[in-house]
Amino acid sequence: MILEGFKKINEEQITRVENTLNISFPLDYKDFILSINGMCAEGELGIAIPLNQEVIAIDILYGIDTETENCNILEWTQEYKEDLPENTLIIGDDVLMGFFILVCKGEDKGVYYYDHAYNLEGSDDDGNTYFIANSFEEFINQLTVIE
């Protein structure tokens, strides 16, 4: 699968975001940001991931300094900082504006879907965050093209 990303960035830009958020990006995520710096889904939502028998259509995987409104990791993570666990980034969203989050370290490390708007059946105040993958690389490998 070939992903079309935003403009290229450098290590200094990543370090600036890491320092601002006081987070160290996992190496696989840093490599993704350096290579394509996020992406917008093309066509009919482009890609999706299976989540408990539901398919979540990815809208955007955020980048750094993208020059595209509402596509920046820093902007979204700072806006929802109070709702997020420590060492967590908001890395993207789906078409219903649920968020894909990356817990960067600790026992809960991995990628999750955060259904803050309770769009999924079964989401409520007691459970609206769903585990997807142990690492960002595993998450990317689960992406499929929507026909």
Residue ranges with predicted function:
Residues 98-104:
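Short, surface-exposed beta-strand/loop micro-motifs that present aromatic residues
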